């Protein structure tokens, strides 16, 4: 992603110097936005997966503690 960001900024400064047409800059900006959206979606998915795993672990701990309590009460 960093490479693409650098490429975008380099192209943008090339455009500001009058060497690039507006349509190609617009296409490059759209491509950059799409990459950012993909990265955001992946980060959300990774976070959701991590939270699911932590919840499963918490449930396992609670269930094992309940079993210990049941054994003590008997």
Swiss-Prot record:
GO terms for biological process: symbiont-mediated perturbation of host cell cycle progression; symbiont-mediated suppression of host DNA replication. The keyword Chaperone does not apply. Transmembrane segments: none annotated. Residues 19-73 form a coiled coil. Keywords: Coiled coil, Host-virus interaction, Inhibition of host DNA replication by virus, Modulation of host cell cycle by virus. The keyword Cell cycle does not apply. Targets the host DNA sliding clamp and inhibits host DNA replication. This is Gene product 168. The lineage of its organism: Viruses, Duplodnaviria, Heunggongvirae, Uroviricota, Caudoviricetes.
